[in-house]
């Protein structure tokens, strides 16, 4: 029998690679042979997983995240398509600031560069209104322009 083990991360506890290593150790103790593959759904930690499979970094950029902290993020070249993981800027682990005080506006600095944006693991819940606002879409409440829309 051939066994293939695929695992994504267990958010807040183990990365996909750590899950795989734990399973591998237990299988080896019990003389179980298998092949092991960390995987991702395109959300948080996608960049790490893709790079483990040899996906090349196309470009590294300095941009501000959802609380204004400058970060270095990477765009990957996946078979000619440029990939960006949005959680690098709006991720759950980027800040302890209340979610209701955050939005996706910081993604406007990078949105035009990738062909594919991995979603998931976001700390925001503004439905993209912050991003749309930065891209020129106006939102109003009681006929008053909302400058920095938040939930």
Language-model-detected regions and their locations in the chain:
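N-terminal loops that bind phosphate or other acidic moieties
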Residues: 1-151
